[in-house]
């Protein structure tokens, strides 16, 4: 079972990593910003921690799978992400924000189970995607920012 320090480290790392992604969304005035991304990741991290805790307590009494709760989180995030997507004038806005919410949920789950390298690398890749690929799209495809 995890000690208090491990639990705190996992929650704080979840906050920091998702905060970086949420800050980018906030700076660009998207529908879901800093607080939403942090809360979503923290909730996902807590759910994973709770799943691991339950598994540790009852592993000898019943067949349990900690991944089942995580799968429920990912399904639930789909509904939350759908709320960030707006159909407007024949176009769709908010897809990138919806995807970033899904990614921070995954980061929260990864930090919750101690999969730090994956969480860190995913955060780096997400930030590269959000910051730099925006400019690549403009240069290569003449695509203007549509998601507001």
List each model region and its residues.
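Alpha-helical transmembrane segments and their membrane-interface boundaries
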Residues: 1-67, 135-139, 148
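Short, amphipathic, aromatic/basic-enriched membrane-interface segments that mark the entry/exit
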Residues: 66, 85-96
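Alpha-helical transmembrane segments and their membrane-interface exit regions
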Residues: 125-135
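Alpha-helical transmembrane segments of multipass membrane proteins
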Residues: 19, 23, 45, 49, ...
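Membrane-interface helix caps and helix-loop-helix hairpins in membrane proteins
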Residues: 27-30, 61-62, 87-91, 112-117
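Loop-to-transmembrane alpha-helix initiation sites
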Residues: 10, 68-69, 114-125
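Hydrophobic, membrane-facing alpha-helical anchors
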Residues: 14-21, 68-84
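Small-residue-rich segments of transmembrane alpha-helices in multi-pass membrane proteins
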Residues: 39-49, 72-75, 99-112
């Amino acid at each position: 079972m995890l000690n208090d320090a491990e639990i705190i480290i996992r929650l704080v790392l979840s906050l920091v990593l998702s905060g970086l992604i949420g800050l980018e969304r906030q700076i660009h005035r998207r529908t879901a910003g800093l607080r939403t991304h942090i809360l979503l990741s923290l909730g996902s991290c807590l759910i994973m921690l709770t799943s691991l805790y339950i598994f540790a307590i009852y592993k000898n009494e019943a067949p349990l799978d900690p991944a089942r709760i995580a799968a429920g989180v990912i399904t639930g995030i789909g509904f939350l992400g759908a709320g960030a997507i707006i159909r407007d004038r024949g176009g769709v806005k908010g897809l990138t924000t919806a995807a970033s919410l899904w990614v921070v949920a995954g980061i929260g789950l990864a930090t919750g189970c101690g999969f730090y390298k994956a969480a860190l690398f995913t955060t780096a890749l997400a930030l590269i995607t959000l910051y730099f690929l925006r400019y690549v799209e403009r240069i290569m495809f003449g695509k203007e920012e549509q998601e507001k």
